[in-house]
Amino acid sequence: GHVSCGKDGRACDYHADCCNCCLGGICKPSTSWIGCSTNVFLTR
């Protein structure tokens, strides 16, 4: 499933205004790559 994130708690998807999902389900702000192990973003 999706990972809740962001100030509004929306589900993590490709939405840049929400967040980027990195491999492993790690969710980070769309403006930060810190903590991401890969540049391949997942939708689920």
UniProtKB/Swiss-Prot annotation:
Iota-conotoxins bind to voltage-gated sodium channels (Nav) and act as agonists by shifting the voltage-dependence of activation to more hyperpolarized levels. Produces general excitatory symptoms. Disulfide bonds join 5-19, 12-22, 18-27, 21-36. The cysteine framework is XI (C-C-CC-CC-C-C). Belongs to the conotoxin I1 superfamily. This is Iota-conotoxin-like Fi11.1. It is found in: Secreted. One of its GO terms (molecular function) is toxin activity. It comes from Conus figulinus. It comes from the Eukaryota. The keyword Secreted applies. Residues 44 form a propeptide. GO terms for cellular component: extracellular region. Keywords: D-amino acid, Disulfide bond, Ion channel impairing toxin, Neurotoxin, Secreted, Toxin, Voltage-gated sodium channel impairing toxin. Expressed by the venom duct. The modification D-leucine is found at residue 42.
